[in-house]
Amino acid sequence: MQTHEIRERFTNHFVNAGHQAVPSASLILDDPNLLFVNAGMVPFKPYFLGQQTPPFENGTATSIQKCVRTLDIEEVGITTRHNTFFQMAGNFSFGQYFKEGAITHAWGLLTGSVADGGFGLDPERLWVTVYLDDDEAAEIWEKKIGVPAERIQRLGMADNYWSMGVPGPCGPCSEIYYDRGEKYGKEGGPVADDNRYMEIWNLVFMEKERGQGIGKDNFEILGDLPKKNIDTGMGVERVACILQDVENVYETDLLRPVIDVAETLTGTKYGSDNTSDIRFRVIADHSRTGMMLILDGVTPGNEGRGYILRRLLRRIIRSARLLGATGETMEQFMNTIMDTMTPSYPEIADNRERIMRVAVTEERAFLKTLVSGTHLFEEAATSIKAAGSTKVAGAQAFALHDTYGFPIDLTLEMAAEAGLEVDVEGFDSLMAEQRSRAKADSQAKKHGHTDLSIYREWVDNNPTVFTGFEELDSQSKVLGLLSDGAKISEATEGQEVEVILDQSPLYAESGGQLGDRGQILLGDTVLDVHDVQKIGKKLWVHKALVANGGLAVGDEVVASVDKQWRHAARQAHTATHLIHAALRQVLGPTAVQAGSMNKPGYLRFDFNYTEQLTPAQVEQIQAITNEAVDTDWAVNTVETSLEEAKAMGAMALFGENYGSTVRVVEIGGPFSMELCGGTHVAHSSQIGPVALLGESSIGSGVRRIEAYSGLNSFNYLSKERALAEGLASSLKAPSEELPERVAQLVDKLKAAEKEIEALHRQQLMAQTADLLNNAQEIGGVTTLLLRVKDNTNAGDLRTIATTLKDKLGDREGVLVIASDNAGKVPFVVAATKAAVARGAHSGNLVKLVGSYIDGRGGGKADLAQGSGANIAGLESAFGAVRAEIEAL
């Protein structure tokens, strides 16, 4: 039975039983604490936690969820049961049926006849486990289902009691195992041999409330839940392994085709030895996981999800090399795994080209460094062993990472294969030093000095109270003054200083929003604030010029925000949120923010996406954004707990460190809801027009949109309109006809250029006919050493040389033709077949000429070309060529 049929039978079984079929969620959810969806119940957590009401008609649902677990990537292939990507088929009940219903449903599907839509498993080969004290489940299995008592085994909390690891719902579980037979191990059930007895289904009975505690079995159970729920998970790949009667999950119809392709590409047979088999399984597993991650929008990177994907793809590449592959292999692996997975995930077909491009690009980038990096490691390993050591120094591991892009995980793998350890502490120390230097450089740029310890007393004792959400002018006290990184007691006119206030309405740069501009006032004293930076998350540092008067520590002042600056900054920041929401509408939920910067009237927004946006997509994003502006939605903010914000549906960015209290900015209800600490307009209409300037790539898998907002947008659009009107006037055409008229002009220009090029070539050929008259005979070789008219390009020189060579026919002939082209000296060398037979070699002659004119080049024996920079050396070069021909 093929895997896609197993999936269909599972879904049909539960739909026929009244469950609502729910499509698999993306592997990427808006949860900053979750790298990937790693269990079938994850998308249903809000319903189990009581944060949302289940929207399913009968209170029951079924899904086959994509899952990725990457805790033990290096163990993949060593064991044959576990995959980094797997499909978890589940049925869920929210206060409807409980233990008996869950057990009956699972047993009916597993043992039901194939003709009736079941899997047809032999009931005599099924074993079950229950929690130690769960007499109810044990009785259902024995009395209602008919499983003999000797095939029902009881296990403790660590094995058969489920919780989320935090306070919340929990309960006992019951697992179903399949006996694969005596060839796989000893008898005695799952407690005796979990290799012979394969777990295929876990039934979780959520009936209790978990309290605080640590681990799987050390927590308090507080009492019963008001509603009892069911969460089950059947391993699709494991059931496929059983129904297809293969040794392990790697030999099912989903993964074995990749292994077959790997055999062909590497010349190594699967099953020949254990080490090779592990590498084959790594290729198969990681190809599927990598492909599915790219499908859901992950791109290779150096941290978070992108780092996991990069690590998987690079392990594929290295495993293929170790098996004997010599060229690129990613295209074949990806094509194969996409073929096997498309029946279950039809969306792969529409994303095939994108998936291939991301994977192959990563392969080509890594192959450039793999050979040299591996060679460096092998040299290091040899010298380490020769010195009687068993440890790779942290500096050596750091060099591999810093110079060749080797992740520490790859170095650890290579070291283990060589019987060595790695000084991970030393590596981490060097990485920390590098980060510290980068941080110091950044601090120096922001503060003019790198020593931030000078701020410690204020950070610890007098953090700044930010008042800028409530007011734009605040009564403040000067707590400190600094100049050139040193504390001072007073500041005088003309001095550049940093001012520490007890409270401030000026926004400090963070979250992509630049710091406010404004003033600090005391009588006639005026300090112009041109930047505000944060130290940590608590202290505001106002960088200011004393424009008039003086200021001392302890003075009572008024801190005032430049209202025009703040208004325009608010416009840009709120526009950033709208553009983010519009992007996700147009491109899908994987277009996640990767960075942003907004300042008055301008914003840029970086997002994870591998494709260049089409003009139509850019226009659609702009239209959705401006429609949101025009709708005049209220911009609401609320401070709440992180858990409550997530329950509300607020978007959080993976990898960000959020405090226990967060600020949610909501625009248009579900249209945009993000965690954000920045300043915003009160209504979306206050943003004014938003004009997208375009989008571009700023790195692998990251693109950038830039836009104007408010008055800047109006001015930009006015200039664009004036430009269009001027062009329309010049072309004597209405504006709406400009694209067509410009296209016509471009076509005419191209036609004229082709005509000019044809005339040029005709003239060139006419001149070429007489050039052989300048040839001389040197030792029986017709030799033409010629500088043609200036600004003849390399292509034309090549045409001249090949034409003249053809004219020489069977004669022995050598041609060297050069030109002075705006300070560069392109040149071509050609030799007839007869001259080559005598010993002439155009490639060698190119190198000879290049040595006289500060140039280089190369090519074949009959034709080569090069370029130099010293036309004055050309005659000497010709003389050297004559000498070479005389010596033939």
From Swiss-Prot:
Presence of the UniProt keyword Transmembrane helix in the record: no
What's in the GO CC field?
cytosol
Give an example GO biological process.
alanyl-tRNA aminoacylation
The EC number of this protein is: 6.1.1.7
Concerning InterPro entries, the annotation shows:
aa-tRNA-synth_II/BPL/LPL, Ala-tRNA-lgiase_IIc, Ala-tRNA-ligase_IIc_anticod-bd, Ala-tRNA-synth_IIc_core, Ala-tRNA-synth_IIc_N, Ala-tRNA_ligase, Ala_tRNA_ligase_euk/bac, DHHA1_dom
Where Zn(2+) is bound, by residue?
A: H573, H577, C676, H680
Q: Name one GO molecular function term.
A: zinc ion binding
Broad enzyme group: ligase
How the cofactor is bound: the record states: Binds 1 zinc ion per subunit.
UniProt domain comment? Consists of three domains; the N-terminal catalytic domain, the editing domain and the C-terminal C-Ala domain. The editing domain removes incorrectly charged amino acids, while the C-Ala domain, along with tRNA(Ala), serves as a bridge to cooperatively bring together the editing and aminoacylation centers thus stimulating deacylation of misacylated tRNAs.
Entry function? Catalyzes the attachment of alanine to tRNA(Ala) in a two-step reaction: alanine is first activated by ATP to form Ala-AMP and then transferred to the acceptor end of tRNA(Ala). Also edits incorrectly charged Ser-tRNA(Ala) and Gly-tRNA(Ala) via its editing domain.
Q: Report what the protein is called.
A: Alanine--tRNA ligase
List the source organism.
Corynebacterium glutamicum (strain R)
Lineage of producing organism: Bacteria, Bacillati, Actinomycetota, Actinomycetes, Mycobacteriales
